[in-house]
Amino acid sequence: MAQDATTYEMPTRRDFVKGGGTIVGGALLAGCADGGADLTRTATESAASATSDETYTVRMEPTGTVTFDRVPETIAGCDPTYIDMLVALGHGDTVESIRTRRQYLTTHYDELDGVSIDLSSLTQLASKKSGVSKEVFYEMDADLHLMDPHWLTRILDSWSDADVEEISKGVAPFLGNVIFRRTDPWHDYRYYTLYEAFEKVAAVVQERERFEAIRSIHEETVEAIEAGLPAADQRPDALLLYAPDEPEEFYPYRLSGKGANKEHFRTLGITDAFADTDVSGFSTSDSGSIDYETLLEIDPDSLLLRYRGKARTREAFEESIVSHVREHEVGSQLSAVKNDQIFRGGPIFCGPLHNLFMLERYAGLYYPDRFADGQIFDRDRLANVITER
């Protein structure tokens, strides 16, 4: 996609009334420049700051500052990472939309009593035929668009900056940052870690205590895992790849790169087997593939394979992907195949609740002798944090 040097300035202040309340939005959408223009804004030290007794502000790159006089009652989402945050904070019922339902894996909620989201009720934003329609945003009439506008202008390549301005003025402001990966050349503004972004969302819905409680569970889980890890030189490396059914080629991700969907692997000390190669990660400008010969040349300790569509059982994963790799003339020579170290790669969009389950799952898969007990965090404790008012 051609890059441009456009810096789009949102309205500095706008007012609109919904259901007796007002949300005042002001933001800057950073363009994707080749010319070196300054496209970032300094973030505030706190996730939210009060501007008066009745309003509060939340600031996030690249969208800038949004001022609220009440907690949003309806929120248009796109990235499941952020929707998982809202569910974690007890505000899943505010979510109006999602990019595509099939990309939002929700089976982990089944283990948390009282935690759920009705996927069928969410408006699906992306359409193969028509892209993303502005009319859908007018129809939803949400209080806030919790998404980086670059989802619409770059990743989905459906909107212009003028379209973003129109919806921001006519419906509601945007707030968000693409955090699921950091391989796109246009992402030259600040990147947020999973919990940095989560803290911003907690500020939006005014759930500081609930956020801190979940962060405590996360920190305790990480501490328990780190205490049980083997020495660094005894930890395996891995290739994280997208694999179609019966794969003949693979699309690489970089474990060493930033991205919320890889944070759990880094916590577990899984290193990137692409580290000493010139292979780059998947992005809007690079969707190159690699073949079995390249895999064998690298010969990683393990393979983490992602796939399209809904979550699959281990049996379905074996049947559609792994069996083909094992039977392939070159694939069968891989150390990961010989040692039975081929695992599902986990969701592309991984929020804070996903992250806890992924930490636990991969700790058991990679280090079964050290994490034989299975559960590392308390499901009931987590569910109570989410559901109690």
Residue ranges of each PLM-predicted region?
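Bacterial Sec-exported substrate-binding components of ABC uptake systems
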Residues: 2-85, 209-245, 306-309, 322, ...
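A short, structured surface patch at a secondary-structure boundary
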Residues: 74-160, 165-166, 273-276, 283, ...
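Structural recognition of the beta-strand scaffold that forms the well-ordered cores
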Residues: 76-77, 96-97, 144-148, 174-176, ...
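Solvent-exposed, polar/charged alpha-helical surfaces in well-ordered, non-transmembrane soluble domains
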Residues: 83-87, 135-139, 165, 169, ...
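Short, structured coil segments at secondary-structure junctions
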Residues: 91, 140, 169-171, 268-269, ...
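Extracytoplasmic ligand-binding site segments that recognize negatively charged/polar headgroups
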Residues: 102-108, 151-160, 175-197, 234-263
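Structured C-terminal subdomain patch of bacterial secreted/periplasmic proteins
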Residues: 185-192, 196, 305-389
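Alpha-helical, coiled-coil/dimerization segments enriched in small aliphatic residues
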Residues: 251-286
